[in-house]
Amino acid sequence: MDVDKLIEAGKIAKKVREEAVKLAKPGVSLLELAEKIESRIVELGGKPAFPANLSLNEVAAHYTPYKGDQTVLKEGDYLKIDLGVHIDGYIADTAVTVRVGMDFDELMEAAKEALESAISVARAGVEVKELGKAIENEIRKRGFNPIVNLSGHKIERYKLHAGVSIPNIYRPHDNYVLQEGDVFAIEPFATTGAGQVIEVPPTLIYMYVRDAPVRMAQARFLLAKIKREYKTLPFAYRWLQGEMPEGQLKLALRSLERSGALYGYPVLREIRGGMVTQFEHTIIVEKDSVTVTTE
């Protein structure tokens, strides 16, 4: 593990997150904001570890704009900005919620305090369910619900989701014990809704999983490009727009997804249409505490 690269990725992620918050004003287009976030990451010496996720209101995650997207920010929107930076595969993952044109409110505070509470109990030897308990308590005591089917995640080199989850609720069977040197993203989501997300179209983010035989020449071309440029990290539909006509691109991606070569991440929406907030940091677990790389 290269701690220096993890720390540097975290510094870039923090800076870009803070700049993105200042840019999130009424009338700004999601496309413009996403492109600024991603190009700024590169300017500062990193690469996007995944597409900028810009999810509004009842959409909790996995929305990234496409070329031609007309969505603009409106006053009162809850905008989740979730961005990732990697240096040589060493990842920092961070998120913040902005209430566009308005002040910080209780729903935002619930997710932010939940994150801080979870970080304060994290250290080597602690079971992840204790972090889930801390998150759930902070959100529920403010009268909101944690989103039960979204969670934080272990991070490894070139692997955004490395198999272990940090739940946003207390679950007795979540007994993975944090180890010194583990890298985790902790990301509480709070909602005014039921506390559950469902998958809805469209799918705007994909990830390479494995090689698989596909007939379509365009699909083979696309797969080679994806492996070369993004390796095992998520990428945006938008990043491939312009590679071939739109209809062919959609067909090629569908064919690659069906074959198991790619995994698609549909947009995630709160099941009852409740408003959703999110805050996230990346931590390196130490013996008696953690290092927060994105703070």
Curated annotation (Swiss-Prot):
The keyword Hydrolase applies. A divalent metal cation 2 binds at D93, H153, E187, E280. Its EC number is 3.4.11.18. Keywords: Aminopeptidase, Hydrolase, Metal-binding, Protease. It is an enzyme of class 3 (hydrolase). Substrate binds at H62, H161. Its cofactor is Co(2+); Zn(2+); Mn(2+); Fe(2+). Binds 2 divalent metal cations per subunit. Has a high-affinity and a low affinity metal-binding site. The true nature of the physiological cofactor is under debate. The enzyme is active with cobalt, zinc, manganese or divalent iron ions. Most likely, methionine aminopeptidases function as mononuclear Fe(2+)-metalloproteases under physiological conditions, and the catalytically relevant metal-binding site has been assigned to the histidine-containing high-affinity site. It catalyses: Release of N-terminal amino acids, preferentially methionine, from peptides and arylamides. It comes from the Archaea. Monomer. Removes the N-terminal methionine from nascent proteins. The N-terminal methionine is often cleaved when the second residue in the primary sequence is small and uncharged (Met-Ala-, Cys, Gly, Pro, Ser, Thr, or Val). This is Methionine aminopeptidase. It comes from Pyrococcus horikoshii (strain ATCC 700860 / DSM 12428 / JCM 9974 / NBRC 100139 / OT-3). The lineage of its organism: Archaea, Methanobacteriati, Methanobacteriota, Thermococci, Thermococcales.
